[in-house]
UniProtKB/Swiss-Prot annotation:
Residues binding ATP: L40, G41, Q42, G43, Q44, F45, G46, T47, T48, K63
Entry annotated with the keyword Metal-binding: yes
PANTHER family in UniProt: SERINE/THREONINE-PROTEIN KINASE
Activity regulation field: Activated by calcium. Autophosphorylation may play an important role in the regulation of the kinase activity.
Residue ranges, annotated region (Autoinhibitory domain): 298-328
Chain residues that bind Ca(2+) 1: D348, D350, S352, T354, E359
Annotated EF-hand domain residues: 335-370, 371-406, 407-442, 443-476
GO BP field: intracellular signal transduction
Record GO terms (molecular function): ATP binding; calcium ion binding; calcium-dependent protein serine/threonine kinase activity; calcium/calmodulin-dependent protein kinase activity; calmodulin binding; protein serine kinase activity
Residue stretches making up the Protein kinase domain: 34-292
Listed EC numbers: 2.7.11.1
Protein name (database record): Calcium-dependent protein kinase SK5
Active site residues according to the UniProt entry: D158 (proton acceptor)
């Protein structure tokens, strides 16, 4: 059972208008696009159905949230935030991908990829407990999702086995996180007081009504305890009894199967279920714990953050590609970039509307980056399109928006049309010159720019050449691509040669 209460409820504005909407724009009726089928599950706030896309026959899951359950303005905001967070995280390999959102007068519908392998919880029930190797593999995936959330300024707040699904019924199926209905954006150092979560998994500081992202690591520690033993660490016949046990914090490592569980596994659990959130392991530290690393399941070198990964990719693009991405970023829907907006605000600590070098350095440090100042300066220069010395909001969105969004045909056509002012079907030298002027770019070698993209050497860029440029080099890029003068050709060379320092991370 998920709990949700907030001290702000006394000032809540009750929504009385029948025509209140969650999404900023009206959508098609979901039944025009999908055939809604059998019921898959029922949650506290919504019902999930299987649905089939009429055009392709593809199978998806649809979470429908009835508006009659949205009693106040905050409830509507919660659903909108869930949608933003899912868009923000859904490119991660272990997060359920959101396909689209629909709304009518009675409900909001979230269409997601269909995971047919069932809940993690069900597999725990079936097996009783996993081997340490199986548990380590699963908890690594879960904590990678937690690390991804935290690096993006998102706190999940309801981690439990039921919120992780396997994509297939196979033994080696991929585990995916779902249900971000209680998740929130947060800033470093920010504390929360509303009691949310599920009884067995809730952290002691949540019960004390003063908590931050450390509470997610506690919940993951509870999941690990269950993965190894088949029972929760804090158990009682009633919710108040469970909460008392959590606040007491006494762990049982004497009952079966704990005597046969390795000391290293128990050490990790103790450090994840530390009563003090300040000394509790972070998600990053969990992934470096010997029990995980020594099993050769997690890499021995910590992954850099998503922000760093995207900035590195961005630094490998040529100038035209950067301008095109800026054009696309400005056309993305609000729900697609809502999470990035929050991330920008988190890094922009003085709320000036721009990110300075020091703010970028501090922001990267907070997400575990170990870059030298010169490397951070290269990233800053790469993102700072207009060379103002700071990164404004538009530049930040352009530098961090997931590159998969580039490849959508409608976005590429829109960006091409922006540069092709006369609608001739070609981008000419003069048109690029005008675009550089519009973007405040000086000292640009336009001939070299065209030469790099112009495959048939006719001195101009057609749509096919433009689309090819935009789609190339969008994979993981290694550490060496941060050189200030790096161009697209160099970046492609690194990708083709298979750099062994590929940056993956939560924007995968």
């Amino acid at each position: 059972m998920a709990a949700k209460s907030s001290s702000s409820s006394t000032t809540t504005n009750v929504v009385t208008l029948k025509a209140a909407w969650v999404l900023p724009q009206r959508t098609q009726n979901i039944r025009e696009v999908y055939e809604v089928g059998r019921k898959l599950g029922q949650g506290q706030f919504g019902t999930t159905f299987e649905c089939t896309r009429r055009a392709s026959g593809g199978k998806f899951a649809c979470k429908s949230i009835p508006k009659r359950k949205l009693l106040c303005k905050e409830d509507y905001e919660d659903v909108w935030r869930e949608i933003q967070i899912m868009h923000h995280l859904s490119e991660h390999a272990n997060v359920v991908r959101i396909e689209g959102t629909y709304e009518d007068s009675t409900a909001v519908h979230l269409v997601m990829e269909l995971c047919e392998g069932g809940e993690l919880f069900d597999r725990i029930v079936q097996k009783g407990h996993y081997s340490e190797r199986q548990a380590a593999r699963l908890i690594k995936t879960i904590v990678e999702v937690v690390e991804a959330c935290h690096s993006l300024g998102v706190m999940h707040r309801d981690l439990k086995p039921e919120n992780f699904l396997f994509d297939t019924i196979d033994e080696d199926a991929k585990l995916k996180a779902t249900d971000f209905g209680l998740s929130v954006f947060y800033k470093p150092g920010e504390s929360f007081c509303d009691v949310v979560g599920s009884p067995y998994y809730v952290a002691p500081e949540v019960l004390r009504k003063l908590y931050g992202p450390e509470s997610d690591v506690w919940s993951a520690g509870v999941i690990l305890y269950i993965l190894l033993s088949g029972v929760p660490p804090f158990w009682a016949e009633s919710e108040p009894g469970i909460f008392r046990q959590i606040l007491l914090g006494k762990l049982d490592f004497h009952s079966e199967p704990w005597p046969s569980i390795s000391d290293s596994a128990k050490d990790l659990i103790r450090k994840m279920l530390d009563q003090n959130p300040k000394t509790r392991l972070t998600a990053h530290e969990v992934l470096r714990h010997p029990w995980i690393v020594d099993d050769n399941i997690a890499p021995d070198k910590p992954l850099d953050s998503a922000v760093l990964s995207r900035l590195k990719q961005f630094s490998a693009m040529n100038k035209l590609k950067k301008m095109a991405l800026r054009v696309i970023a400005e056309r993305l829907s609000e729900e697609e970039i809502g999470g990035l907006k929050e991330l920008f605000k988190m890094i922009d600590t003085d709320n000036s509307g721009t990110i300075t070098f020091d703010e970028l350095k501090d922001g990267l440090k907070r997400v575990g980056s170990e870059l030298m100042e010169s490397e951070i300066k290269d990233l800053m220069d790469a993102a700072d399109i207009d060379k103002s010395g700071t990164i404004d909001y538009g530049e930040f969105i352009a530098a961090t928006v997931h590159l998969n969004k580039l490849e959508r045909e409608e976005n590429l056509v829109s960006a091409f049309s922006y540069f092709d002012k006369d609608g001739s079907g070609y981008i000419t030298l003069d048109e690029i010159q005008q675009a550089c002027k519009d973007f405040g770019l000086d000292d640009i070698h336009i001939d070299d720019m065209i030469k790099e993209i112009d495959q048939d050497n006719d001195g101009q860029i057609d749509y096919g050449e433009f689309a090819a440029m935009m789609r190339k080099g969008n994979g993981g890029i290694g550490r060496r691509t941060m050189r200030k003068t790096l161009n697209l050709r160099d970046a492609l060379g690194l990708v083709d040669n298979g750099s062994n320092q590929v940056i993956e991370g939560y924007f995968k």
